[in-house]
Design a protein with these regions (language model features):
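Active-site metal-binding loops of divalent metal-dependent hydrolases
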Residues: 13, 139, 235
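Conserved phosphate-binding/catalytic region of the ribokinase-like
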Residues: 2-4, 186-280
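Conserved beta-alpha-beta core of the PfkB/ribokinase-like small-molecule kinase fold
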Residues: 131-195, 202-206
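Conserved N-terminal subdomain of the carbohydrate kinase-like
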Residues: 27-38, 53-132
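Hydrophobic anchor at the start of a short beta-strand
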Residues: 7, 57-58, 84, 153, ...
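Structural beta-sheet core signal
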Residues: 9, 60-62, 155, 173, ...
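Glycine-rich phosphate/adenosyl-contacting loop at the front of the ribokinase-like
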Residues: 1-61
């Protein structure tokens, strides 16, 4: 299946230290890591890399710290094939600590200020007018307005504080059906998103249209043994946005997104196993 779409992400980046442990430490417990490594991560970064693999090119509008870690993050994103447009902030780059347990589940502790792009940043925002779809994970209201210039705009509840009250219409909001922090996030948005996609992991999920039409999808089978869950949700959302940008019907777009989530879930954090154009 040959698909084409011009895609972009507006959002945030973290520099992540992963530690593989038998289980997440209980209060007062010391648990030895069997493996550890550093990698660029965060919702925006994971989505941008997934989109670069599917579309061949992905624009990423972001903001980074002015320290060496911020520079490492930008360099690594470019190595992963992302076209990075980053404003610099006079703060330390946001980091995160991620435990990966024997079940592949991730437990995340962010460290530092969440750094997001602003619409007044000197970035090539006009390029978004020629984009088919944008995934928005963070930024101010002006940055969200720039993102809305694309044909399709998909967002995560992580950007709720910006989206709520902005008056910007979303083509889709992709949220968790199980996370208490994301359940029913659409209820506070005006205008309401045209489409709400509620993911439920191995149970698949459900979509709800603005006209109250609904549908469900089944989770795709893993292409191999279960790996790390880190990045699976954002890989799903990015692939769904890519499919919308390529004008696939909702059910087909969700089937593709489900495959992307399953492929990532069968890989190592943060990017191994992500779906590519060759897999379509």
């Amino acid at each position: 299946m040959a698909l084409a779409a011009r895609v972009a992400v507006v959002g945030h980046v973290e520099w992540v230290t992963f530690a593989r442990v038998p289980h997440v430490p209980r209060p007062g417990e010391i648990v030895e890591a069997t493996e550890s490594w550093d990698e660029v991560g965060g919702s925006g970064a994971v989505a941008a890399v997934q989109l670069a693999k599917l579309a061949g090119k992905a624009l990423f509008f972001t903001a980074l710290g002015s320290d060496e870690t911020g520079s490492r993050a930008e360099d690594r994103l470019r190595e992963l094939g992302v076209d990075v447009h980053a404003a610099r902030r006079d703060v330390a780059q946001r980091r995160a600590w991620v435990h990966l347990d024997d079940e592949g589940e991730r437990t995340i502790t962010p460290i530092g200020e969440r750094i997001v792009p602003h619409g007044e940043d000197d970035l090539p925002w006009d390029e978004l007018a020629g984009v088919d779809a944008v995934y928005f994970t963070g930024g101010d209201v002006a940055a969200l307005g720039h993102a809305r210039r694309a044909r399709r705009l998909v967002a995560t509840p992580r950007a709720y504080d910006t989206i709520a009250g902005s008056g910007v219409d979303l083509d889709a909001l992709v949220r968790s059906a199980k996370d208490p922090g994301e359940q029913h996030a659409e209820e506070g948005l005006d205008p309401a998103p045209d489409l709400v996609v509620a993911t439920a992991g191995k149970e698949g999920g459900e979509w709800i249209g603005e006209d109250r039409s609904t549908g469900k999808w089944k989770a795709a089978e893993l292409p191999g043994p279960k790996g790390d869950s880190y990045g699976a949700g954002d890989s799903f959302a990015a692939a769904f946005m890519f499919a919308l940008g390529a004008d696939l019907p909702i059910d087909d777009a969700l089937a593709l997104a489900s495959r992307a989530g399953a492929h990532k879930l069968a890989g190592r954090a943060a990017y191994d196993g992500q779906l590519t154009a060759a897999d379509l």
